[in-house]
Amino acid sequence: PRRAQERGTMGYALVEFTITDSGSVEDAVTIEGYCSSKRPDDPEVEFRPCSMFNSASARAAIKLKYKPKIVDGKAVPVEGVLHRFTYILDES
């Protein structure tokens, strides 16, 4: 998100959703988000709860496509799938 980029904020958001029997995503909800002014690979990084990445992550999740789960030869939905979206600023 632009606001995070302008502030030099990095972090992540964890999104939960359902993969439908056609492989699309629905019901995407961000369940937690954390921010830091340091890179996630920095040993001194300290994350704090924040919502800066929540809406962008939920919108991105809806665009994901998966190969449907097959049970007994039939595609079935999968609920409670978790995906972590990580946001790291480019150092260039």
Predicted regions and their residues:
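Charge-biased low-complexity segments
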Residues: 1-92
